[in-house]
Each structure stands twice: as structure tokens, then as C-alpha cells.
Amino acid sequence: KELRGALDDRFELTALALEDRVLSKLDGTEKFLFRTRDGHFIESVLIRRDGTDEGRLTVCVSSQVGCPMGCGFCQTGRIGFRRNLEPAEILDQLCLVRRLSGVRNNNVVFMGMGEPFLNYENVITAADIMNYSYGFHLSVRKITISTCGILPAIERFIDEKRPYNLAISLNDTDPVKRARYMPVEKKYPIETVASLLEKKFPVSRNRLTLEYIMRRDNISPEDARRMKRMFRHGWIKLNLIPLNRGDHGMDLPTDEEMDRFIKDLEVMNVPVSVRKSSGKDIDGACGQLSGRRYHAAGRTHRGGRA
């Protein structure tokens, strides 16, 4: 015990330290705030799909401290960009979430803070170790990397035959509206991304998902028709995400408006799924991660070194 204490005092075996931890009262989602060795803060989320430890368990990891993309509906973008995370810092999120929660997840999504494809090398290294038989031994089908549309990295990902699932944050098919909410549109237009995917993606073995945050101004019948024209092949799946509350100043759609949009897409045979927003009450859902301590009831653990 004396030796263990001396080692703990002199050496750190983890790249991150637990700063805060909070549990959703709605659905069992758990959010973790970690501190890096140089004093930055990042967040990870454990999503219990059916609210228990028995069903699908997904860990959402961050790839950057902050984010440089500035998407209007995302709290992370308001922080600005600090730096890329190292592979060890990405992997440590998974290690610590598993250790602290006592569960073994079966899915990982790179959908936390940051733009994964602006940290391409480190993200791919971390994903490879997650898949490696002497690492976490997760199936490549259980690892998903999301991007807002960094065209050169998407092409590189496909050309290198990376086996992981790919998710594109689409959110608008109208380039004018998309540029208003997603500045990346000005550099890498979604029409160009769609052309690349149409040319190269069908011959790859990857699964492609388009993520679409439903706002009140992007779920019209014309939006549905543009979606069908732009992605007219059956090898994509559209994942619809209701806009979550935040200080973005955008109007949330009603259930009736979202249902009508879903029906418009289904009539046109667009493969659609609707993502349940997990952890809304703890600011742990899509677009809500801000790298700050949570100040409300529901906390399960606070502070301490992991």
C-alpha cells in the first residue's frame, strides 16, 4: 500500500482527470467532464439507449478542445478552438467512462466536442486502437466518425479504405441556409461533398449516415424534395435529430411539423430514422456540449481524480 501511494503521488497513468459527472433523470444518460493535464476541459457522454446497462451502450467521445467550425446550433462552437486531442486523450475518455460507470460499452461515436476530421491522424489512430484485438477489440461496425463535411479528409478516408462508419452533418440541403448556420459550406459546399460521395462511396464497404438537425426553417416539402434529388441512391440513411434547446436563438419545430417532414421523406422512399435526444436535461444531447460544469440536480458524482 505504501508503494502504491508513492507511485500515485509521483506518476500519472491517465491523460485526463475527472472533474464532474452527472446523470440524466430522464433516460440514464451520463455526462463526464474531464480536465486535461494542461488545464483544458472536454466532455464525454455515456448513452444508455433503453435507460439500463443491459441494452445498447454508446460512448460519445470528443476529438478537440472546443471547435473551430462555428456551427450556429452547437454550443461547442461558441467556445472557440483550443487544440487537438492526442490519441491517448481520446482513448482515455473511453477508459475512464468504462471504469467510472462499471459498464462495457459496445459502440463508440466521435460526435463529442470538436471536428474529428480536422484531427484526422489522431482520430484514426484512436479508432484503430479501439478496434485492435489487443486494444478495446470493438468491431469496426461499432465505431462511427462524424464530420461536418471536410472534403479532403472525407476523400482521404475513402481512398485509404478506412473501415469505420461515416456520418456527415448535413442539416440543410439549401446552400444559402446551410452557409448561414454552418460556415464550412462556404469552403466545402454540400453539393461538392454529395458529388464525391456519389462517385466514391458506393464502392466502399463503409456505412454512411447523413445527420440532419430539424429546425423550423429546414423541414418544408421543398427541403424533402432537395434531399431526394441530392442523395438519390439507396446506400445512405438519413438520421433526423430534433433541434435541442440552447442559446442559439433558433425556433424549435413542433412534433406535428417534424412528423409531416418525416412522412414527406418516407413517401419519396428516403431511408429515415429519428434519433432520440438523450441527456437533454443535463446538456448532454446533440449540440449541447460546452466543456463546463453542470449546475443542476441529478448529479451522481463530483470532482476527484479518476
Language-model segments: which ranges?
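C-terminal catalytic core of tyrosine-transesterase DNA break-rejoin enzymes
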Residues: 290
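Flexible, acidic/Gly-rich N-terminal and inter-domain linker regions that tether
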Residues: 1-57, 301-306
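Canonical Radical SAM [4Fe-4S] cluster-binding loop centered on the CxxxCxxC motif
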Residues: 50-89, 96
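Conserved AdoMet/S-adenosylmethionine-binding subsite of the radical SAM
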Residues: 98-107, 112-275
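Secretory/periplasmic and organellar redox-cofactor proteins
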Residues: 295-299
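A short, acidic, flexible beta-alpha connecting loop/helix-capping segment that sits on the rim
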Residues: 276-282
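Short linear Ser/Thr-Pro motifs
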Residues: 24, 62-63, 146, 169
